Structures are given as structure tokens and as C-alpha cells.
A protein has these predicted regions:
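Large, well-folded core regions of big proteins
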Residues: 691-702, 708-709, 713-716
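Secretory targeting and sorting signals
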Residues: 1-27
């Protein structure tokens, strides 16, 4: 499809004027179950409230008492871990709260009317705000007011992070996080204003309606700020405790916050330079042909055995991997130098320490961990679709997501949103439908190599002209505060922008100096996706799978969207995917001279032609759908930074269980779907998928008693499901010895299996793209998303069979392909692991005094406000916000 980068939208005028739907009379505000199809439950730990006054902060320091509704959903969330093995349908309500529209009169905790036409009602049990507006703008105002009530200080942190100004706001320890944001989403105020003023898709009329929503939302935030400055019971105590200044909000703050979350959860690709460095290292060691073949095995771009959400084929960027057309690989033997972002820092310690900015930066680096599972009506016990849905956004105190319910002309929705962009529910339910997402990580980011000219690293050649790069500067200054003792200092963040995007590094291509530039389709267009979220909240845009897909297609960030109502289910992969210049490589940098631009590229408006609607992976009423950030569909190439889509993925853990549940004509209940998710949430993928083949490979050589005893422990762990959990709550995992062996063995195993052939330098190069998946340097919960498990398995399968494995490597690594030599290699690596003590594996950070897996793996909540300190919860590899849904009736 040819058209602008941000596809055209055709929203009926009736939708824009919000007159197409009936809503309950304003006098009936809060009526329980009004316009509700029934069957909705959810949980969002730790709790709804994020407001802590100075007095509450001091009370917590004195006696550890939380403000009300700060942590009352955590017991539900944690409790499912222990109930999961024997979960029944009647127990689901014990672990997911009622998410029905409205509040029963007997359950109303508070009613606030911040202005005429706006009513906000909260329930006694969990304090979730229900916002009712007489007009659409009243509803948006209420959303802003309620959001500020629950997350004002966090919203301030987020807008400053989005603007790369967090160091100036909260201290110099945040400077690295600011530099990361500035390198990825550097915007001037003019840029942010333009995002809402001059949309690249749809009519100006519909964007006027959207802009009115944003402005009313900001008005609501500012109304709360104004009131809080007069009423200390509404003012977050962090402002006083940290000496931070509270300023009014602007619409540009909403755009800056959107750029932050879009950059963390809604992008994929952009690692072309790293990939190029790896292929160069392999070429140097094995020669060009063999080196590239080995690179392809690790790359796993389109492994034929990779699990997918939909079975159909949706071909995208499969060809031309090593095309020489415009190819800009760094010259062999040369280095690529990262661009310097931080300049003029007056204190080295400003780069140290932990901060909220660091936490969000880590989410960007860690990858994505959401999952959802949907069963079609013909496969469920109640004859209606069943869904367990949720995004994983990490764990924070207070949570970086918040829940709200919105009602007004044309709007009925409840669910989770990111504070600061919460004018709409982003993940949740409507009248008689629910939707959710996982990060897809599909390729919407490329790298162009700008050929430098004019004897300067800040000039580049484009379409025959030598152009100046645009210099973008963010000045920073900070003082020490109660949370960050970094000495006072100042610095400048500097990036350079070309027509393609932001400069990330410098290198040499064919002897010419180049600047490598990140080109992201959503850059300068963060606002474009708002249209899709707006539609999700409007029942007349979400009545059918077709309408849902059209709504989801307006979201330019890369997400796997799931939908279900009382009859149907659907899936759609959203995202703005560029049509690359014909014949160019989608895997490596290409020259930015203008000849190899994206098709239809308009440098002035930063638009181009996009992949058409029907070309995106999608399906309707598929019997079973699972997404755990896995590959969307066959022949949909993994993004250049995604090397983990091998012959199995963690989504198999859930899908295998559900396939067994519905096999032979059987049907699944809601509890069984919840159980499949939760049982998988504590499994170690290595135990479930790799160890059985490892044991088989080790049998080619006799085992001594020490090895045999270790293997016996591991086998018993595998037979029990390979879980990392403590069901009896004694503080020690079941099969703890086996888990300790596995964690100590894994890095030694991979080193022994691959390093003799690859060499240490090449192994480290590959690990810069995809790490082993072993125990990390600091206590952390394992996600089992990306690691070397499929590499190890496919290599061992080749050794055992003596035959190439489809999608695998061109050579055998373990023991050079000899069964006995491989077995000895594996056994020797296991022996070496048995000499490692738990203290050597886990005795760091928070686990110095408790060096064991159950300590190391805990879900540790990062603090985003001052009332509390870091908390640790039992490990679950599970979504943060989660819905359990089976819609009871169709209201259409």
C-alpha cells in the first residue's frame, strides 16, 4: 500500500462528535453494572494509591505503615502462585478483583466533583477511580484529575524522563538515563508541539477532537495541582522531602511521556551496527561464506520451527540479507565509536547510583515479558471466548501503570494506563469486550550510514549536497537531595540529527568516514498512535473483530493485540513498518545518501510508505492464541535485534499446556487458562526444553558417580516440571539443589560447547546481542525470553543425529560434532559447576546473607515515590496488570 507513513484514518463524524452512543444519564452516575456485559476481573499490584503526603512518608519511616490502597492487591497477585497447581473456577475470584463497571452504593468510599459535570467515585475495597463526565471533555478532565490524585509525583518523574531532564529534577544519578532517552527520542519543544498540531494521518477535524481530549486531560491535571497546593492532604510529600518543584502541565508533557513509553515497549530493531560487527568477526575467523552461514544460525531470522501466534504466512523482509546494494558494513578490522552524548559533566559521580530513570532504562534494555492467552468460544467450557491478558511492565512502588474507569458520551472503558498519557484506557475492557497487548518488537527501526563531508563529523552528504547536522542540546544542572547525594553539578546532553534520525555512532565504510543514524518510523510521530487507543475506548469502534483490527492498525507502535467479546476473538500486529528500498538489506546498515531511503520517504515530514493493513499478521476466531513476545507468524522476519526466535520459545510453555487441555475434543475453563499461564510463570525453560536432550548427549560417555548424582537431581527436577518456586513457603525452592546446579552449570556449559570453535572474542561479540540467559550480575527475576537455549539444543540435536537441523548451524560445535567428545565436554563442564558454591553464584547485592535462588529470583519492586523502600515478592514470570475475562453477554 502506498501512502503516508502514518496510515489514513476514516473515523465517522458521528464518532468525533461523540453522539453515536447512548450513555447512562448523569444522574445515574456510578450505577453498578450499567452497560456491562459481565465476566470481567483483573489485578494490578501492589495497589491503586500512589499518593503519599509528607506525614505519611514520615509515618512509614517510623512504623512501616502504608497509606490506604497502596498494597492491597499484592496479596491477590502473590496468592495465585500457591493456588495454581490445584486452581478451580470458583477460586479465580480470590486472585482477580471484580472489574464490573460502576460501584455498588454500599461499596462507595468517596465521591469527588472537581468541577461541574465531573464525578469521580472510588470503591472501599481497592480505591479504583470511576470517572463520569457529562460531556466528553468532562470525562477527559476527570481522567487527568484522577490520574494526578493517584500518581502526580510519578507523572512528574515520567515527563522529566521523557524530556531527558530527570537529573535536573531529581539529581545527578539520573544523568545516564537522561542520556539514553536523549539518544533515542531527542525532541525540541517545537517538535513536541508539532506532533499534535500537524498530524500526518487522518483529517484535521478528527485531530482537533483528539487534541481537545489531550487539552482537557491536562486541564484536569492542573486543576488537581492547583488544589493540592492549597490542601496538604492532596500534595505528594516527595516535593517537600526532595526539594523538587511542581510546575503546571502542558500538552507537550503528554507527548514527551508518550515518547518514553513508546520507546520502551513499542519498538524493535535498530541493532544493525552490532549485527554487522558480529558478522565481521565471524568472517574474520571462518571466512566470508562460512562466517555468514554461522551468523545466520545465530540470527534465527526465520527459523522454520519457531513457535508463532498465528499459523498463517505473512512474509516480511526475508530477502536480501547480504545484498551489496547500499550495504554499509563497517570495514573489516575497524572499530565503531559510540557518539558522545554527555558533555561537560562537572562530577563523575553523577553517573553512579540507582534511580527511577535507571529503572526505566533497564526496562528498555531487558526486553519485554508480557503474555496473553485466548481460547475461542468453540473450545471453552462455557461456550464463550476466554482470555487471560496482560502486559508486563516491571514492578514499581507505586506501580508505573494505574487503573481507571472512564464513562462519558461515546466512551465506556476500564483498565490500565500509563500515568501522564492516561486520557484513555490503554489495556482493559469496554462494555462487552476486552483487549490487551504484548510488545512485539518487530522491526520499525533501521540504521543509515551518513557519509561525512566537508572535513567535519557534523556534515553529511544527502542527495548530492553536503548538509549540516542539526545539533540538539539538553542542558542539565542538579543539586544533592534526600534521595540522591550526588554532588551538585551540570552537564550538556548533545545529539546530532540528520534527515534520517539521530546519530548513534561513527565508523568507516569502504574507507569513508560515516555517521550511523537511528531511523525510527515513530520518531516525530509519537502522537499518531493516540487515535488507536482512543478507538479502543469507544464501543462503536470495537463491536466486531474487523473493527478491532482497524482500531489496532492505527497504533504505530509495534504490539501484539488480542481481542475478545462474548462470541469472537481476534489478533492484530500493529506497527508502522517501512517499505525499504528495493534490494537493500533489512539486517545491516545502508547508505544514507538518499538513493536507498525508505520508499516514499519525505524528509520534511518524516513520513514514508508503509506495509499495508492486510499484510500485518492477524487472525479471527483461532481456536487457541498465545503471545509471550514470541514470533507473530510464519515468514515474519525477526527484527535485527531479536536473535531468540529459535526452534522453541517460552510461549511453548503455555501453549503446550493449553493444547493438552483442549486435545481430543476437550474444552478449557477460565481457571485452566489461568493455571496454564501461572504454571508456566515459574518454569525454567532450560529444564523444560533443553535438559532432556543434554542428558541424552551425555550418555555417549560413561559418567562418574559425581556427575551421575548431579544428573539424577536434575532429572527429578525436570520430572517435577522444572519450577523455580517455594510452595511450602519455607524460604527454599523445591529441588533447590538441582536449580543451584543448573545456574552454576549453564554459563560453563555454553562456554565449553561453543567457545573452542568460536573463540572468546566472537562469543563475547554475540553475547553483546543475545546473552547466555544465565544468572546476572545482580539479583533479578529470570524472564527466559532470550538466551542461548535454542542454540545449545539445536547443536546437540545435530551431534546426536549427525544431520543438519533445519534453521540451525552449518557446523556442529559441541565436541566438534563427535558424540563421545561432546559427552566428555558436557560432563567436564558439569563437574566444574559442581565446585561452585551458592555464595559464588548468588552472594551479591540483596542476597549476600541469603545466597540461594529463592532470594536471587525475587520480583523486586523499584521505588518511584518516597513512602516506601524496595520490596521483594516471590518470583513469577507473569504480567504486571492482568485480566481474567469471559464476557457473559453481547450488548450490541
Amino acid at each position: 500500500m502506498t501512502g503516508p507513513l502514518w496510515r489514513r484514518i476514516a473515523i465517522p463524524a458521528a464518532t468525533l462528535t461523540a453522539l453515536s452512543l447512548s450513555v447512562p444519564a448523569f444522574a445515574d452516575t456510578g450505577s453498578y453494572g450499567t452497560n456491562d456485559g459481565g465476566g470481567f476481573r483483573n489485578v494490578l499490584p501492589p495497589g491503586q494509591n500512589g499518593l503519599d503526603t509528607l506525614g505519611q512518608i514520615l509515618a512509614f519511616r517510623a512504623n512501616g505503615s502504608f497509606p490506604k490502597h497502596w498494597a492491597d492487591q499484592q496479596p491477590l497477585y502473590d496468592g495465585l502462585l500457591y493456588a495454581s497447581p490445584t486452581l478451580t473456577d470458583s477460586q479465580v475470584k480470590d486472585y482477580y478483583k471484580d472489574a464490573t463497571f460502576g460501584v455498588k452504593k454500599s461499596n462507595r468510599e468517596s465521591t469527588v466533583k472537581p468541577r461541574k459535570g465531573v464525578t469521580i467515585i472510588r470503591d472501599k475495597k481497592f480505591g479504583v477511580p470511576r470517572v463520569y463526565g457529562k460531556t466528553r471533555q468532562d470525562t477527559m478532565f476527570g481522567a487527568g484529575y484522577a490520574s494526578a490524585n493517584d500518581r502526580l509525583f510519578l507523572m512528574d518523574v515520567l515527563r522529566h524522563t521523557g524530556r531527558a531532564e530527570l537529573a535536573s529534577f531529581l539529581g545527578g544519578a539520573n544523568l545516564n538515563a537522561d542520556a539514553n532517552q536523549w539518544s533515542f527520542a531527542a525532541y525540541t519543544d517545537k517538535d513536541l508541539k508539532k506532533m499534535l498540531k500537524a498530524p500526518a494521518q487522518g483529517s484535521q477535524k478528527e485531530w482537533n477532537a483528539l487534541r481537545d481530549d489531550v487539552e482537557s486531560y491536562v486541564d484536569g491535571i492542573n486543576a488537581y495541582i492547583k488544589k493540592a497546593k492549597k490542601d496538604g492532604s492532596l500534595m505528594p510529600g516527595e516535593y517537600t522531602a526532595l526539594g523538587a518543584t511542581l510546575k503546571p502541565w502542558k500538552t507537550t508533557d503528554v507527548m514527551a511521556t508518550a515518547s518514553l513509553f513508546g520507546g520502551i515497549f513499542g519498538r524493535g530493531g535498530g541493532a544493525e551496527v552490532t549485527s554487522a560487527q558480529i558478522v565481521r568477526a565471524l568472517e574474520a575467523r571462518f571466512g566470508v561464506d562460512q562466517g555468514r552461514a554461522i551468523w545466520s544460525g545465530f540470527r534465527a531470522k526465520n527459523d522454520p520451527a519457531a513457535p508463532t501466534t498465528v499459523p498463517g504466512s505473512f512474509p516480511y523482509q526475508l530477502k536480501n540479507t547480504f545484498s551489496t546494494k547500499g550495504l554499509a558494513l563497517p570495514d573489516q578490522g575497524t572499530t565503531v565509536t559510540p557518539a558522545t552524548i554527555i558533555k561537560g559533566s562537572t562530577t563523575a559521580s553523577s553517573l553512579q547510583g540507582q534511580s527511577m530513570g535507571d529503572a526505566l532504562l533497564q526496562e528498555r534494555l531487558d526486553g519485554h515479558h508480557s503474555n496473553w492467552e485466548v481460547i475461542a468460544a468453540n473450545k471453552s467450557t462455557n461456550g464463550r471466548p476466554v482470555g487471560v491478558l496482560g502486559p508486563q511492565v516491571g514492578y514499581y512502588l507505586p506501580q508505573v501503570l494505574m487503573e481507571l474507569e472512564l464513562h462519558g458520551p461515546g466512551i465506556d472503558a476500564r483498565g490500565a494506563s500509563f500515568p501522564g498519557v492516561s486520557m484513555y484506557v490503554q489495556l482493559g475492557r469496554g462494555r462487552d469486550y476486552a483487549w490487551s497487548a504484548t510488545s512485539a518488537g518487530s522491526d520499525n527501526v533501521d540504521t543509515f550510514a551518513e557519509v561525512l563531508c566537508g572535513g567535519s563529523k557534523y556534515k553529511y552528504r544527502y542527495k548530492g549536497k553536503c548538509l549540516d547536522m542539526e545539533k540538539l542540546v539538553r542542558k542539565q544542572s542538579w543539586k544533592p537531595n534526600a534521595a540522591d547525594p550526588t554532588p551538585a553539578g551540570k552537564a550538556k546532553l548533545v545529539v546530532y540529527r540528520t534527515v534520517h534520525g539521530l546519530v548513534n555512532s561513527y565508523g568507516t565504510v569502504n574507507g569513508k568516514k560515516v555517521a550511523y543514524v537511528t531511523a525510527r518510523t515513530t520518531y516525530l510521530h509519537e502522537a499518531d498512535s493516540i487515535v488507536g487507543f482512543m478507538r479502543f475506548n469507544q464501543p462503536d469502534q470495537m463491536q466486531t473483530p474487523k473493527q478491532f483490527k482497524k482500531s489496532a492498525s492505527k497504533i504505530q507502535f509495534t504490539f501484539n493485540w488480542a481481542y475478545l467479546n462474548a462470541k469472537d476473538t481476534a489478533y492484530y500486529l500493529s506497527g508502522a513498518y517501512p517499505k525499504r528500498a528495493k534490494g537493500t538489506s533489512p539486517d545491516f546498515p545502508v547508505l544514507g545518501t538518499g538513493k536507498y531511503d525508505w520508499q516514499g520517504f519525505d524528509a520534511k515530514n518524516y513520513t514514508s510508505d508503509l506495509l499495508g493493513f492486510s499484510k500485518h499478521p492477524n487472525t479471527t476466531n483461532q481456536s487457541l492464541m498465545v503471545s509471550w513476545n514470541n514470533k507473530p507468524a510464519k515468514d515474519w522476519a525477526a527484527a535485527d535485534d531479536q536473535w531468540g526466535y529459535g526452534s522453541f520459545y517460552r510461549s511453548d510453555l503455555i501453549e503446550d499446556k493449553l493444547e493438552a487441555v483442549i486435545a481430543d475434543g476437550k474444552k478449557a475453563s477460565l481457571a485452566q487458562v489461568v493455571q496454564a499461564m501461572e504454571e508456566s510463570a515459574t518454569q525454567d525453560i532450560r529444564a523444560a526444553k533443553v535438559l532432556p536432550t543434554l542428558f541424552a548427549a551425555m550418555e555417549a560417555s560413561p559418567q562418574d558417580a559425581q556427575v551421575a548424582a548431579a544428573v539424577d537431581k536434575l532429572m527429578k527436577w525436570v520430572s517435577a516440571g522444572g519450577h523455580r518456586r517455594d510452595l511450602d513457603k519455607d524460604g527454599v525452592y523445591e529441588h533447590n539443589d538441582a536449580i543451584e546446579i543448573m545456574d552454576a552449570w549453564w554459563p560453563k556449559l555454553l562456554t565449553a560447547q561453543f567457545q573452542p570453535a568460536l573463540g572468546e572474542d566472537v562469543v563475547n561479540e554475540i553475547r553483546s546481542m543475545i546473552n547466555f540467559g544465565a544468572v546476572t550480575a545482580n539479583p533479578s527475576a529470570p524472564q527466559f525470553s532470550d538466551g542461548w537455549w535454542t542454540y545449545s539444543l539445536q547443536d546437540l540435536q545435530r551431534v546426536l543425529s549427525g544431520q543438519p537441523v533445519p534453521g540451525g548451524f552449518p557446523i556442529a560445535f559441541c565436541g566438534n560434532g563427535e558424540k563421545v567428545a561432546c559427552a566428555v565436554t558436557l560432563q567436564d563442564s558439569l563437574k566444574a559447576a559442581l565446585a561452585v558454591t551458592p555464595a559464588q553464584t548468588y552472594g551479591f547485592g540483596a542476597c549476600v546473607s541469603d545466597p540461594q535462588p529463592s532470594c536471587w529470583n525475587k520480583n523486586r519492586a523499584r521505588v518511584t515515590a518516597g513512602v516506601t523502600e524496595p520490596r521483594a515478592y516471590p518470583f513469577q514470570n507473569r504480567p504486571t496488570f492482568q485480566q481474567a475475562v469471559s464476557v457473559e453477554k453481547d450488548l450490541k
